[in-house]
Amino acid sequence: MNSRLIAGIKGLLPISSRSLRGFRVQDDARYAQLFQVINDQRKALDKAQESLDRLEEQCRGLNETLEYIHDSNGVMYWQLFRGDHETTEQAQLRFFRGLPKAEGIHALFQDAEARLFELFDQFCRDHGISYWGTGGTVLGAFRQQDFIPWDDDIDVYIAREQLSRLETAVREDGRFRITVVWDWYVPCKQIRFRSIDEDNPCFVDLFPLDWVSGDPEDAWQVCTQERMQFVQEIRKQYAGSSWSRDVYISGADPLISALELNLHRHLEDLADRVSILPTADGATGLIRGIENIDEVRPSGPYLTGDWTGSTTLPFRGIAVPVPSNYREYLSKAYGDYMALPRDMHSHEHVADEYIASPKSVRAMRRILSDDGERTPGDEERR
C-alpha cells in the first residue's frame, strides 16, 4: 500500500495512549514551570510591598519629626518676636500685617479687585442683599485687614435666595454682570460678580449656601454625599466631551443647559433627603451648595445663630460681614490659622497672562480712577 496513503490514514486515527501520556507529561511540566514563575513573582511582590510599607512608615516618622520641629520652631520664633507687654497673638498680627505687599501687576490686580469688592459691598447694601466673606477673604480680613499678600481673589458666601435677588438687581442696574463658568478640573460651577467692562479681569467669587432645618450636622453630611454623587455623575457623563477637552465652558455652550439640568436634579434629590428652606425663617443652619468647589478641610456645619448674628471684619476699609464665630470657622478651614504659612514663597498668583494684557491693565486702571460707573468706551468718547 502506498506509504503516503498509510500516513494519511494514521493521521485520522486516534492517538495512542502512550502519545497521550507524553503530551500530558509535557503539559504538566509546562504548568509546573508557569506556577513556579507565578509563585516567584508573588514572593517578589510581597517583598516589594514589605519594603514599601517600611518606607511609608519611615516617611510618616520623618513627617512627624518635621511637624514637631516646625511647631517647636514656631513657638520659639513667636517668643523671640513678641515685644514687651505684647501677647503672642498681637505679635502674630504685627508679623502678618508687616509682610511685604504684592508688587507690580499683582499689586494693580489686588487694588482693582478691592475696588470691585467695595462696589459689590455697596451694591448689596443699596439693595438689601446679605452676604458673608469666606475662605481667604476672612483670613486676610482678620490677619492682614487686607489681602493675604500671595492671594488675589475675593471669596463670598451668599444664600441662594439672596443670589437670585442679586442676579435680578444686576440685570436691572447695567453696571455689572454675573458670569457662570463650569470648571472641569474640580469640577464646579464658578459664579462671579464682575464689571460690565469685559476687559476687566477682576471678579468676586460667589458661593451659594442653602438654608436647612433639622440637625445641621446631618444636613452637612448628606450634602457632602450628594456633592460626591453629583461630581461622579458628571465626570462619567461628560468624559471625552468638549467640556473635558476645553476645561472651562460658559455662555452659549450647548453643554451648559445639560449641566444645569444635572445640577437641578441633584438639588431636588438633596431636597428629598434634607429639609431645605427658601429663606432663613425656621432655619437651623446653612449648607454649602453642591455646585461649589470642594473645601480642603470641612468648615461646617454652619449654625444659623452664628451666621444671622454675624459681625464684621475690616478689609481695606470695607466692613466685611463674617460669622460671629469666625475664629472657629477659620480653625476648621485652616487648622492653626496663625501659624507661619508654608506657602509664602511657593503660592502662585493668578497667571500673569490673564491680567497683564494692555486691555486688562487699562480696564483695571479705569475702575480705580473713577466710581466704577463708567462703561467701556466712555473715555474714548470724551
Positions of predicted regions on the chain:
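Boundary detector for helix-to-coil junctions that initiate low-complexity/charged tails
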Residues: M1-L93
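Helical scaffold of the NTase/Pol beta-like nucleotidyltransferase catalytic core
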Residues: N63-G133
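Conserved catalytic core of two-metal-ion nucleotidyltransferases
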Residues: K101-R125, V170-Q225, Q229, Y238-A333, ...
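Active-site nucleotide-donor binding segment shared across nucleotidyl transfer reactions
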Residues: D121-I154, G305
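Beta-sheet entry/capping signal
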Residues: S130-Y131, D155, T312, A319
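Tryptophan-centric aromatic hotspots in well-structured domains and transmembrane helices
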Residues: W132, T137-L139, F147-W150, F315, ...
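Surface-exposed, flexible loop/turn segments at secondary-structure boundaries
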Residues: L139, S164, V212-G214
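Catalytic metal-binding acidic patch
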Residues: Q144-L166, G317
